[in-house]
Design a protein with these regions (language model features):
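Conserved ABC ATPase "signature" region
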Residues: 106-124
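The feature captures the beta-strand-to-loop junction immediately N-terminal to the Walker
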Residues: 35-37
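H-loop (His-switch) and adjacent beta-strand-loop-beta switch element
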Residues: 201-214
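H-loop/switch region of ABC-family ATPase nucleotide-binding domains
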Residues: 189-190
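Conserved ABC ATPase signature
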Residues: 128-132, 136
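Conserved ABC transporter NBD signature motif
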Residues: 58-70
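Catalytic Walker B motif of ABC-type/P-loop ATPase nucleotide-binding domains
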Residues: 153-156
């Protein structure tokens, strides 16, 4: 079942075309990594998928899923890292957009606690978010995204700024969500080797070339060979 279909998609940023005639689809249970050099339009594409930025032409179609069933984990900013709230408050805020209520209820709190437990950070629920390590903060934000996600997780550079141990732990969590719970994942990544290791499909965006297909097909392409040096 296809959850997302993009056809002949063109998008611009600050009046500059960054995506041109991009076509791909995401099926239920896919783990799609979006890779490519800086400025290739990866984050712009994310905004298009989330409905935050309209395409200049082409289509973005969601099927069997609404915008309130998508969890989003953006790149962290300095302001976010210093956010003055408890872990539970940060996570439970993820339920607000899904329920369209201004305030959370007992069910929302239960959902937040379940996701904290799922990511093995329930013991941190009363800690101040800004006091946590980078890896712990990213788990908290992922738990927040899961409060909104019932079918699809969209992640923008989820491992950015994390140490190698935290990166490995986060990829393990994402693999469990994808394989054991059939959560569909779309992730922008600057780390092509990790993308190849963890994804079943790759969308490579480039200024001159683009690729969409299965990971095993991607690693046979000239694009992959050129970037990795044939590793």
């Amino acid at each position: 079942m296809k959850l997302l279909v993009c056809e002949n998609l063109c998008m611009s940023y600050e009046n500059k075309k960054v995506l041109e005639n991009i076509s791909f689809s995401v099926e239920k249970g896919d783990y799609l990594s979006i890779v490519g050099e800086n400025g290739s339009g990866k984050t712009t594409l994310m905004k298009g998928i989330l409905g935050l930025m309209p395409p200049t032409s082409g289509t973005i179609m969601l099927s069997g899923i609404s915008g309130t069933e998508i969890g989003y984990l953006p790149q962290q900013t300095v302001v976010q890292k210093d956010f003055p709230a408890s872990v539970l408050e940060v996570v439970i805020s993820g339920t607000v957009g899904k329920s369209k209520r201004l305030f959370y209820n007992s069910y929302d709190k239960k959902t937040a606690l379940e996701n904290l437990k799922k990511l093995d950070i329930e013991h941190l629920k009363n800690r101040s978010y800004k006091e946590l390590s980078g890896g712990q903060q990213q788990r908290v934000l992922l738990a927040r995204a899961l409060c909104a996600a019932s079918k699809l997780l969209v992640l923008d550079e989820p491992t950015s700024g994390l140490d190698p141990i935290a990166v490995a732990e986060l990829y393990e969590i994402l693999a469990d969500l994808n394989q054991k719970e059939q959560m569909t994942i779309i992730a922008v990544s600057h780390d092509i080797e990790s993308a190849v290791k963890n994804s079943n499909k790759i969308l490579h965006l480039g200024r001159d070339t683009a690729f969409f297909g299965k990971t095993e097909e991607y690693i046979q392409t000239d694009i992959y060979t050129r970037i990795t040096g044939g590793k």
